[in-house]
């Protein structure tokens, strides 16, 4: 194989390596946890990822002791938990 062909192959492999994590990204393991309202009694609007619905859902958070499936906004929830095939 010529040096030009090797450079092309190397370039394609590099591009594939860079793009693969974006296209096959999986959600964080905490996204499978049930929503945890916490022990406190504050009424804070929060979002959690609901795997059965494959979307983020609003819930009322008590204000402390949250698990990893707890987000301040729908956008943050979707960024962390939605899969990108």
From Swiss-Prot:
Assembly and interaction partners: Heterodimer; disulfide-linked. The A chains have phospholipase A2 activity and the B chains show homology with the basic protease inhibitors.
The keyword Metal-binding is assigned to this record: no
Signal sequence region: 1-24
Domain BPTI/Kunitz inhibitor: 31-81
Organism per entry: Bungarus fasciatus
Disulfide bonds: 31-81, 40-64, 56-77
Subcellular localization: Secreted
Job of this protein: Beta-1-bungarotoxin is a presynaptic neurotoxin of the venom. The B chain is homologous to venom basic protease inhibitors but has no protease inhibitor activity and blocks voltage-gated potassium channels (Kv).
Family designation: Belongs to the venom Kunitz-type family.
Protein name per the record: Kunitz-type serine protease inhibitor homolog beta-bungarotoxin BF B1 chain
Tissues with expression: Expressed by the venom gland.
Recorded GO MF terms: potassium channel regulator activity; serine-type endopeptidase inhibitor activity; toxin activity
PANTHER family associated with the record: BPTI_KUNITZ INHIBITOR DOMAIN-CONTAINING PROTEIN (PTHR10083:SF374), KUNITZ-TYPE PROTEASE INHIBITOR-RELATED (PTHR10083)
Alphabetized UniProt keyword annotations: Disulfide bond, Ion channel impairing toxin, Neurotoxin, Potassium channel impairing toxin, Presynaptic neurotoxin, Secreted, Signal, Toxin, Voltage-gated potassium channel impairing toxin
GO cellular component, one term: extracellular space
């Amino acid at each position: 194989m010529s040096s030009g062909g090797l450079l092309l192959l190397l370039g394609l492999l590099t591009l594939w390596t860079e793009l693969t994590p974006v296209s096959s990204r999986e959600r964080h393991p905490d996204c499978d946890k049930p929503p945890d309202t916490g022990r406190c009694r504050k009424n804070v609007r929060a979002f959690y990822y609901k795997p059965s619905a494959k979307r983020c859902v609003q819930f009322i958070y008590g204000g402390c002791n949250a698990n990893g499936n707890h987000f301040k906004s729908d956008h943050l929830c979707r960024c962390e938990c939605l899969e990108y095939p």
